Amino acid sequence: MADYQGKNVVIIGLGLTGLSCVDFFLARGVTPRVMDTRMTPPGLDKLPEAVERHTGSLNDEWLMAADLIVASPGIALAHPSLSAAADAGIEIVGDIELFCREAQAPIVAITGSNGKSTVTTLVGEMAKAAGVNVGVGGNIGLPALMLLDDECELYVLELSSFQLETTSSLQAVAATILNVTEDHMDRYPFGLQQYRAAKLRIYENAKVCVVNADDALTMPIRGADERCVSFGVNMGDYHLNHQQGETWLRVKGEKVLNVKEMKLSGQHNYTNALAALALADAAGLPRASSLKALTTFTGLPHRFEVVLEHNGVRWINDSKATNVGSTEAALNGLHVDGTLHLLLGGDGKSADFSPLARYLNGDNVRLYCFGRDGAQLAALRPEVAEQTETMEQAMRLLAPRVQPGDMVLLSPACASLDQFKNFEQRGNEFARLAKELG
């Protein structure tokens, strides 16, 4: 455990994670200073009076006088103020690094462009099914520092690339990169390999590395080694097995679960289940309770969630598809009896949309494109695309056209922040309109 006594600590970024950092230091007899570029950041009213605060901008004077800077994942390490501090030899960490220095129980660590919240939650459910006292959080749910507890027997953390950039003490019992597709390219000017390099930090000092056999970018930089266990659709130690019209989860040649016993559906969710099972096995959880958890887990909101099934039409909320890879995962292997009415749009974060084109060639596809990058998305297949300013306009346009057997799918391939507070608000709005229009 690290000793912070007498250190001049500056925390950048408030919100729930920033407050958890403040509480962490106060409990150790250190009163940090806090700054946030927002004038009235969330959590400002909960900050103890003794804590100095600076809002509306960064305070370079405070930063250059610090012994330790705890940076929010929301601020790029390339920011001039942080670059200057790093050049001056000032240590810059994030909340996950603070957590890793303190945690006494094993850690399962999960990252990836898509599926990480589902897999994190699933591994947590597997641990609970085994009667293990588990703490689940990080990039979802509770900030990691709020999970610290002497009685905790296992931690399961979802980690973003931004969080991994400031983490060096992670020693996971099992770690995975589920997949690597273009995302956050606005934060990674050197492209996909720079983004991948941040993700790969999760494998440093990991006991077992769970890699995706179908995605070479998830492999450690020197290639697979004796620490690696793999999962995949047809390849890998953990893979899918198709026999006589049925699909099984299979581990090293042994069929362990028929997917019809699972509440989750879709090929991408079956591979998520394989990854979760590989992590749970590596963490020493009993296989039987892990499989039981797979039969009861219903999935997370806004992730290929059926919000309405009415008059033979399925309305599916996949608002969490905030990048191209996630929408690809939703469309890959998707079967629709009638027409697929696909809602795309928002802020594409400088991504290349062209990989989507191959999924949009069918005669039964109609595109409804909205938001900041709607025109770019409509250009993927203009003859079947219509462009509107908002998602609501798009839904009101398509609603009179749907027939029994059709599917209305919101899988936007973009962030929501151009028109919504977050992907949850976008998904809730879709669900509300589906119930009104369907």
Curated annotation (Swiss-Prot):
Which pathway does this chain act in?
Cell wall biogenesis; peptidoglycan biosynthesis
CC cofactor: Mg(2+)
Where along this sequence does the record place binding of ATP? G112, S113, N114, G115, K116, S117, T118
Kindly list the residue ranges recorded as spanning the membrane: none
Which Gene Ontology cellular-component terms appear in the entry? cytoplasm
| Keyword Cell division found | yes
* Major subcellular site: cytoplasm
Q: Which InterPro entries match?
A: Mur-like_cat_sf, Mur_ligase_C, Mur_ligase_C_dom_sf, Mur_ligase_cen, MurD
* Alphabetically ordered keywords of this record: ATP-binding, Cell cycle, Cell division, Cell shape, Cell wall biogenesis/degradation, Cytoplasm, Ligase, Nucleotide-binding, Peptidoglycan synthesis
EC number(s) on record? Answer: 6.3.2.9
Tell me a GO biological process for this protein.
peptidoglycan biosynthetic process
One Pfam family cited in the UniProt record for this chain: Mur_ligase_C
Catalytic reaction(s) noted: UDP-N-acetyl-alpha-D-muramoyl-L-alanine + D-glutamate + ATP = UDP-N-acetyl-alpha-D-muramoyl-L-alanyl-D-glutamate + ADP + phosphate + H(+)
Tell me a Gene Ontology molecular-function term this record carries. ATP binding
pH dependence comment: Optimum pH is 9.0.
Task: State its location(s).
Answer: Cytoplasm
Question: Function, please?
Answer: Cell wall formation. Catalyzes the addition of glutamate to the nucleotide precursor UDP-N-acetylmuramoyl-L-alanine (UMA).
Cross-referenced HAMAP family: MurD
Q: What does the similarity note say?
A: Belongs to the MurCDEF family.
Under which name does UniProt file this protein? UDP-N-acetylmuramoylalanine--D-glutamate ligase
